[in-house]
């Protein structure tokens, strides 16, 4: 990315941030995404942005995130998950499968299901309203619930406006095992 100037990201405030998986001095490594997010809570609280994009680092794709954010805003969603239709990649860890309404609203979500054919599988990319993200992180931590898919997403999927965005481009899961 270099300085990020070509993408208007070379600012002292806002722009693009790559955050470490742990943000506390007394913490060597995070065991879950929720712990990692909780460790950067101060950054999330002081940020002025309305939305947060969460993405794992083991999927390669050329996705227009601005389209995902626009769909999130257009749907007045609280959470938008990115998915792809096809066969679940072999090395995807804890795959999620979405049942999606025609308008993109989430109908159901399964974690690590037995699926033999094509389905709507999650790419572990989410756009979330920042204040809601902070609230849900605090709730999960206070209840000692640290599984992102089960405790953060699945447990809350019918309490909030949850939509899905279909990515129709090429993607590949990176696996070093």
Where are these regions (language model features)?
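Unchanged
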Residues: 1-177
């Amino acid at each position: 990315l270099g300085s990020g100037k070509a993408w208007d990201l070379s600012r002292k405030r806002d722009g693009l941030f790559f955050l470490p998986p742990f943000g506390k001095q007394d913490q060597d490594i995070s065991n879950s995404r929720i712990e990692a997010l909780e460790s950067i809570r101060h950054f999330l609280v002081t940020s002025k942005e309305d939305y947060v994009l969460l993405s794992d680092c083991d999927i390669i794709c050329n996705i227009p995130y601005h389209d995902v954010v626009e769909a999130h805003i257009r749907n007045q969603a609280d959470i938008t998950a990115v998915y792809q239709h096809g066969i679940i990649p072999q090395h995807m860890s804890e795959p999620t499968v979405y049942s999606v309404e025609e308008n993109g609203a989430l109908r159901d979500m399964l974690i690590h299901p037995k699926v033999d054919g094509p389905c709507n599988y999650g790419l572990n990319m989410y756009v979330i309203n920042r204040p809601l993200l902070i609230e849900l992180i605090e709730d999960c931590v206070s209840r000692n619930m640290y599984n992102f898919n089960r405790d953060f997403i699945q447990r809350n999927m019918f309490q909030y406006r949850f939509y899905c965005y279909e990515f129709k481009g090429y993607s590949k899961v990176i696996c070093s095992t």
